[in-house]
């Protein structure tokens, strides 16, 4: 999720997170998969062995098992999925975004990405 970032509010959109998620196959090639994505936002606890603090926000799951729905979020030039997640409030601290990928065969993959607030 290296391209993932906080986005500021403007006249058109609320503050949010632009999240990019890539899934790799056994040959380390980024691929499309029929999966469901779940996003959760946590406070970042500074100088802690467990930096993930209180959960701030969740979003409804993104079920991408339908090919047409999957294509809506897939950015072929990046070989990744792009999600625009609206925030309930303006970002005022650093966060950790956790994404869980749920496969149809009940496997789960989880990744976390730190998000730094911009001045």
Q: Regions from the language model: what does each represent?
A:
Residues 20-22, 40-42, 84, 100-102, ...:
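Residue-level recognition of well-ordered beta-strand positions that form the cores
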Residues 1-18, 24, 32:
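Beta-strand-rich domain onsets/edges
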Residues 26-30, 46-48:
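Short beta-strands and strand-coil junctions in structured, solvent-facing domains, enriched
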Residues 106-119:
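Short beta-strand elements
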Residues 18, 34-38, 94-96:
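Exposed beta-strand and adjacent loop surfaces of beta-rich binding modules
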Residues 31-35, 91-93, 109:
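Short loop/turn segments at connectors of secondary-structure elements within structured domains
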Residues 54-96, 102-106:
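Short, solvent-exposed, Trp/other aromatic-anchored flexible loops in extracytoplasmic proteins
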Residues 35-55, 99-101:
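Extended low-complexity, serine/threonine- and proline-enriched intrinsically disordered segments
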């Amino acid at each position: 999720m290296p391209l993932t970032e906080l986005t500021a509010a403007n006249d058109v959109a609320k503050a949010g997170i632009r999240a990019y998620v890539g899934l790799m196959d056994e040959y380390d090639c980024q691929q499309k998969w029929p999966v469901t994505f779940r996003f959760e936002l946590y406070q970042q606890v500074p100088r802690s062995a467990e930096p993930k603090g209180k959960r701030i926000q969740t979003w409804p799951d993104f079920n991408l098992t339908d090919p047409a729905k999957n294509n809506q979020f897939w950015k072929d030039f990046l070989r990744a999925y792009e999600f625009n997640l609206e925030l309930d409030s303006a970002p005022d601290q650093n966060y950790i975004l956790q994404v869980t990928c749920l496969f149809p065969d009940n496997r789960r993959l989880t990744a976390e990405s730190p998000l730094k607030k911009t001045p």
